[in-house]
């Protein structure tokens, strides 16, 4: 098979050499270092709000909007353009991340742990079930083997399940509202929602697919009022987390934040900004919970830079992504900020910055920093077990010193976990969540 048949680096056929000049290549990749904030975005002319068109389509009988109701106990936040976005805090349907479950299991576990700590009842206040699929966004962005129609069908299939999932547990349609764990899914779903609202042709095409799958309600597709990311839930719950659950003083911990491009650069008008966080200039996510917990939030010069993952670059240009991660992120937060930890809010970012630090050692670049999600750091501060819940043993970056600096004995936690594993081997398993609920039971 020729290169022009399969595309460069094994990608789809439409990925062909561009032969760009150096200045053209720099312009084409400027998003890597792009600044998206209140200072650099033109806020003068009001952008189109896709939600307004959703209400019109619903009135015309085209779609059903999955609404956030008072039962979801929403908290209103402000986005980049000053628009109001509603974040539900209960009755949540967990839309899991394939990368988190496979590479960073302590990421979703920490989130579920928090809901349990708040007294949320599984099957009533939240649902974590297996009847869902990957968003498949990486297939599209990473390898070029997907298309918008397939992405839209997957989006609608999963959000239909969220809409109807409460029925088998004795609730009404729309009881559980989707909470998206992955930043890539979050950005992809927001783009796809916009395409669906704008294109009658796309809606008709996916309707045929969903009809065959039994994923229509009264012959209509279901689109959520808001696309909500888990870190937005953490943001609106941050004061309750700090006020009700925090057990460890983290005022001596130097925290740096990497905000995911997929969160605030894709469909940037939907990202949360807060005047009490970073002056309201940068997205508040992640930083806000570290700030609420009392940690020292330290700025650094490459805050806006991509983590290095870059969708398909992690597959076909691994050396570039690893060197970018080490030189534009890890080195900077270590040398400029002297960070104790680098937190983030996306699957790909955490994976890239955590798993690739070994490459620095291979090239005698002896700098490293613990990397974890905002919700994992928050869970540690609230007394979650570093091994059973936060699951730092899955991380490749060195987390031992951070844990010790927080006043938690890594050695004792490891011994306790090893003893727990023997209990598991003996069949005495401790569940965070009823496994029958995950499979549709009660």
Question: Which stretches of residues belong to each language-model region?
Answer:
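Iron-sulfur cluster-binding electron-transfer modules in prokaryotic oxidoreductases
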Residues: 2-442
């Amino acid at each position: 098979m020729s290169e022009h048949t399969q595309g460069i680096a094994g990608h789809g056929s439409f990925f062909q050499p561009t032969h760009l000049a150096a200045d053209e290549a720099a312009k084409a990749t400027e998003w890597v270092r792009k600044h998206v904030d209140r200072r650099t975005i033109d806020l003068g002319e009001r952008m189109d709000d896709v939600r307004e068109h959703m209400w019109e389509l619903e009135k015309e009988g085209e779609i059903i909007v999955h609404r956030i109701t008072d039962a979801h106990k929403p908290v209103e936040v402000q986005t980049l353009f000053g628009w109001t976005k509603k974040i539900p805090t209960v009755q949540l349907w967990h839309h899991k991340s394939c990368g988190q479950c496979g590479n960073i299991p302590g990421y979703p576990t920490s989130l579920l742990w928090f809901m349990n700590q708040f007294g949320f009842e599984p099957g009533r206040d939240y649902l974590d079930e297996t009847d869902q699929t990957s968003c498949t966004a990486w297939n599209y962005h990473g390898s070029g083997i997907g298309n918008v129609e397939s992405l839209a069908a997957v989006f609608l299939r999963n959000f239909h399940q969220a809409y109807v999932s409460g029925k088998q547990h004795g609730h009404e349609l729309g009881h559980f509202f989707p909470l998206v764990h992955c930043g890539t899914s979050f950005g992809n779903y927001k783009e796809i929602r916009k395409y669906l609202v704008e294109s009658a042709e796309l809606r008709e095409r996916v309707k045929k697919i969903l009809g065959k799958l039994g994923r229509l309600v009264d012959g209509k597709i279901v689109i959520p009022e808001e696309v909500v990311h888990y870190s937005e839930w953490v943001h609106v719950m941050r004061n309750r987390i700090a006020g009700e659950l925090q057990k460890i003083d983290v005022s001596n911990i130097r925290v740096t934040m990497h905000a995911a491009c997929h969160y605030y650069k894709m469909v940037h008008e939907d990202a949360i900004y807060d005047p009490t966080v970073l002056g309201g200039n940068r997205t508040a996510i992640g930083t806000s919970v570290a700030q609420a917990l009392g940690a020292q939030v330290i700025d650094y010069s490459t805050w806006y830079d991509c983590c290095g993952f870059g969708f398909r670059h992690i597959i076909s240009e691994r050396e570039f992504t690893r060197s970018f991660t080490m030189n534009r992120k890890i080195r900077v937060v270590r040398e400029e900020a002297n960070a104790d930890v680098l937190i983030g809010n996306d699957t790909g970012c955490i994976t890239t910055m955590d798993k690739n630090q070994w490459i620095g050692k291979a090239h005698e670049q002896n700098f490293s920093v613990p990397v974890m999600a905002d919700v994992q750091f928050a869970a540690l501060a609230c007394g979650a077990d570093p091994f059973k819940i936060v699951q730092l043993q899955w991380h490749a970056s060195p987390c031992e010193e951070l844990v010790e600096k927080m006043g938690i004995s890594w050695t004792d936690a490891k011994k306790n976990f090893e003893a727990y594993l023997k209990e598991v081997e003996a069949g005495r398993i401790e569940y965070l969540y009823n496994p029958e609920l995950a499979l549709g039971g009660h």
